[in-house]
């Protein structure tokens, strides 16, 4: 029989219950027993939503208090030694690994965090050593599975596969071949399967998303040997791939001794024919035809026609599903009461997407007439979106068509610009700055909420925000920072803020998705041509600059990041949408410069995350991404200093594109990797200034001055003294004021020590070894 199933459901809860509960636990306001009870309630709610929608096989094990990769590391006992001695409690150990701090107050350096493939979700990077051991260490998956079965759900446990788990981890200390760990790891996977089998489970979903990457031959071979060795203890295995095409990994994937294969049709429709021709006759094919990464409702008529054709070949060996876990979309469109009615009709969130999968499955089982009403209603929605006049703006399209190469070049090269900027800004050696945002207190959030709800008027809101900006400027001046920021206190999110002010973009009220841990974001929805009617940031930056003689940065989010962190229209190339955003930002940059702002930061933390997973597609993306950044940034004089910021970026393979952005200063996240990221600059002479993140803002732990100095000295192995900036890893929005002021004070002290030690008149006197960071 054709089944409807799902690869994973959002964890955060319809009202973000997960976030509120886990943060209360971190603050010591609730017990661990209360934490676990909330986990049970959230999972039961998620399973009920899916079952009532008509999903046949319910994913179990997709819930996590922080991250599913972290959960897998803890489950198999891959707990770094620095955490083992700190906590006997496995839940607190997990939180300590993620945050560097456990609820009991114990601190140590957190595990590294990076992006999950090309999404805006972040995972905690497993750490492996040459003497790594594994053991079954956590029974969370078994408890959840048992709970689902006891509540009469047909449970399909979900786990990250062994090859993807190793690939996503990193060697700590001495480098070695991670595949050597399989011999110790596979018996633990076998234990997991044995226990799941003993519970009465029929199917298990094993996620191996790295099969859509360019894999080295030894990793391809490892798939064959690994899955031949794995003992599933009579469980049926659905091997799940997503985010791209199997391509050269298709043949080996079809050879694996598993019972079914899931493919991402939405991201890689061209692979379908090859999959159908190579799939062994006894295997299930799960077709991910509902887009798990975007919010547009499915064209059910078109999808059903495609699935009917597949069914004619596969019969009951066809399953229907979203393309990937629904972790990446909001939970329930029914919670949106303020969206324009026509716009809302075009959308589908997680609850609606599992219903779409169930509708299609029913159509395959019982015939089109069984879902005739749904098909008719859906057809009306599809036509409405295609013909709506609100999508196209002739003025925007004309402006985009008139863009020339000249608009994407600065007046002179960086060396000339730097001399002019140095004379104007009068900055010291090792200039200090922050990335942009400052702590968002409950008072600030309440102020913005009251303003949005109409409880306070424009005048009072502006007065209050100005008071907050003045306080932030005063704190920075007192701390001794060199280039200041206004704190972004008027912004709820670095992308949503601009989404609210740009035409062609809609904002939801409850469209939250998980970014990392308890951090949730509310991506804007780009539904039409994008344009700027009026200045978006000017009044706040002008006011902040009026309070100090030091430079205050204008703060903008770049075109690629706005694109990456939004749900984007799918009726034109993403590059075209990015160009429209870049033109709107260019107008804003020029307005800021005309007002006297001398430093303007255009954040592009998502620049690398948008990179296609397959290298063959890189060049096309990098060309248009670089052009869009330059289109936004190059309309200013030489004297205006352009900054950009990037997150979690491995630069080695795209360093030339980073340089091509031609930002005067780039700040990057690097502290968790202990400056390892700067190895990119060993062979490439990056010409502009760099500010490697000198302390980790994602952890509440405050670094010692000596630690900051040590990281700066490591950075000097790759960056000339006159080009090195001192700054945190990222914005400070999620930290509290006590942590922020103390950490920045230590950062400024470290910069002063460095200036003294590395002044041009004397030999460095700082008591640190000048050698590259260990890897």
UniProtKB/Swiss-Prot annotation:
Gene behind the chain: metE
Pathway noted in the entry: Amino-acid biosynthesis; L-methionine biosynthesis via de novo pathway; L-methionine from L-homocysteine (MetE route): step 1/1
Catalytic activity, reaction form: 5-methyltetrahydropteroyltri-L-glutamate + L-homocysteine = tetrahydropteroyltri-L-glutamate + L-methionine
Any one of the GO BP annotations: methionine biosynthetic process
Record-listed 5-methyltetrahydropteroyltri-L-glutamate binding positions: 16-19, 115, 519-520, 565, 609
Top enzyme category: transferase
Function description: Catalyzes the transfer of a methyl group from 5-methyltetrahydrofolate to homocysteine resulting in methionine formation.
SUPFAM superfamilies recorded: UROD/MetE-like (SSF51726)
UniProt source species: Coxiella burnetii (strain RSA 331 / Henzerling II)
EC number: 2.1.1.14
Keywords carried by this UniProt record: Amino-acid biosynthesis, Metal-binding, Methionine biosynthesis, Methyltransferase, Repeat, Transferase, Zinc
Catalytic residues (UniProt): 698 (proton donor)
Pfam families from the UniProt entry: Meth_synt_1, Meth_synt_2
Cofactors, names only: Zn(2+)
GO MF term list: 5-methyltetrahydropteroyltriglutamate-homocysteine S-methyltransferase activity; zinc ion binding
Family to which this protein belongs: Belongs to the vitamin-B12 independent methionine synthase family.
Protein name listed in UniProt: 5-methyltetrahydropteroyltriglutamate--homocysteine methyltransferase
Binding residues annotated for Zn(2+), in chain numbering: 645, 647, 669, 730
Cofactor note: Binds 1 zinc ion per subunit.
Entry binding sites for L-homocysteine: 435-437, 488, 603
Binding site for L-methionine: 435-437, 488, 603
């Amino acid at each position: 029989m054709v089944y409807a199933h799902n690869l994973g459901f959002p964890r955060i809860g319809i009202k973000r219950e997960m976030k509120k509960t886990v943060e209360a636990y971190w603050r010591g306001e609730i017990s661990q027993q209360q934490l676990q009870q909330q986990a049970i309630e959230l999972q039961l709610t998620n399973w009920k939503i899916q079952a009532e929608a008509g999903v046949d096989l319910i994913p179990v094990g997709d819930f996590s208090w922080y991250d599913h990769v972290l959960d897998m590391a803890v489950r198999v006992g891959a707990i770094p030694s620095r955490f083992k001695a700190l906590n006997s409690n496995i839940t607190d150990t997990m939180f300590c690994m993620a945050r560097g701090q456990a609820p009991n107050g114990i601190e140590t350096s957190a595990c590294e965090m990076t992006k999950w493939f090309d999404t805006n979700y972040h995972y905690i990077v497993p750490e492996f050593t040459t003497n790594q051991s594994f053991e079954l260490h956590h029974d969370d998956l078994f408890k959840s599975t048992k709970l689902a079965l006891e509540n009469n759900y047909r449970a399909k446990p979900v786990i990250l596969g062994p090859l993807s788990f190793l690939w996503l981890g990193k060697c700590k200390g001495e480098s070695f071949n991670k595949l050597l760990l399989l011999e110790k790891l596979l018996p633990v996977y076998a234990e997991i399967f044995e226990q799941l089998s003993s519970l009465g489970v029929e199917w298990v979903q094993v996620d191996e998303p790295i099969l859509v990457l360019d894999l080295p031959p030894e990793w391809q071979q490892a798939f064959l040997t690994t899955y031949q060795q794995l003992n599933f203890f009579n469980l049926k295995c659905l091997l799940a791939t997503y985010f791209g095409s199997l391509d050269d990994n298709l043949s080996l994937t079809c050879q694996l001794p598993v019972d079914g294969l899931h493919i991402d049709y939405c991201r890689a429709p061209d692979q379908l024919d090859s999959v159908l021709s190579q799939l062994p006759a006894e295997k299930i094919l799960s077709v991910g035809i509902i887009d798990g990464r975007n919010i547009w409702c499915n064209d059910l008529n078109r999808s059903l026609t495609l699935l009917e054709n597949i069914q004619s070949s596969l019969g009951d060996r066809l399953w229907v599903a979203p393309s990937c876990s629904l972790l990446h979309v909001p939970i329930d469109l029914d919670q949106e009461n303020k969206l324009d009615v026509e716009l809302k009709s075009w959308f589908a969130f997680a609850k609606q997407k599992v219903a779409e999968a169930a509708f299609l499955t029913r159509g395959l089982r019982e015939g089109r007439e069984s879902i005739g009403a749904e098909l008719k209603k859906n057809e009306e929605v599809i036509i409405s979106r295609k013909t709506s006049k609100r999508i196209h703006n002739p003025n925007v399209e004309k402006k985009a068509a008139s863009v020339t190469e000249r608009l994407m070049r600065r007046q002179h090269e960086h060396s000339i610009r730097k001399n002019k900027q140095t004379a104007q800004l009068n900055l010291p050696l090792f200039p200090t700055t922050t990335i942009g945002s400052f702590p968002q207190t409950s008072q600030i959030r309440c102020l913005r909420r009251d303003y949005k709800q109409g409880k306070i008027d424009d005048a009072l809101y502006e007065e209050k925000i100005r008071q907050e900006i003045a306080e932030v400027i005063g704190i920075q001046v007192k701390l001794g920072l060199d280039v200041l920021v206004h704190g972004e206190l008027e912004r709820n999110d670095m992308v949503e803020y601009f989404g609210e002010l740009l035409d062609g973009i809609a904002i939801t009220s409850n469209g939250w998705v998980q970014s990392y841990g308890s951090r949730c974001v509310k991506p804007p929805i780009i539904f039409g041509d994008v344009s700027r009617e009026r200045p978006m940031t000017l009044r706040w930056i002008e006011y902040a600059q009026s309070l100090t003689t030091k430079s205050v940065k204008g703060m903008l989010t770049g075109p690629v990041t706005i694109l990456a962190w939004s749900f984007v229209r799918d009726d034109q190339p993403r590059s075209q949408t990015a160009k429209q955003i870049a033109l709107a930002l260019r107008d804003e940059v020029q307005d800021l410069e005309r007002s006297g702002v001398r430093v303007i930061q255009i954040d592009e933390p998502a620049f690398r995350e948008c990179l296609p997973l397959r290298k063959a597609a890189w060049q096309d993306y990098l060309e248009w991404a670089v052009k869009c950044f330059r289109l936004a940034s190059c309309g200013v004089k030489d004297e205006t200093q352009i900054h950009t910021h990037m997150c979690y970026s491995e630069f080695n393979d795209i360093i030339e594109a980073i340089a091509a952005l031609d930002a005067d200063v780039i700040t990057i996240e690097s502290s968790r990797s202990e400056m390892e990221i700067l190895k990119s600059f060993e062979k490439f002479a990056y010409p502009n200034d760099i500010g490697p993140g000198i302390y980790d803002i994602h952890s509440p732990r405050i670094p010692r001055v000596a630690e900051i100095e040590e990281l700066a000295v490591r950075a000097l192995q790759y960056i000339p003294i006159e080009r090195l900036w001192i700054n945190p890893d990222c914005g400070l929005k999620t930290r509290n004021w006590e942590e922020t002021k103390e950490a920045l004070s230590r950062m400024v002290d470290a910069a002063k020590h460095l200036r003294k030690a590395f002044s041009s008149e004397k030999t460095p006197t700082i008591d640190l070894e000048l050698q590259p960071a260990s890897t």
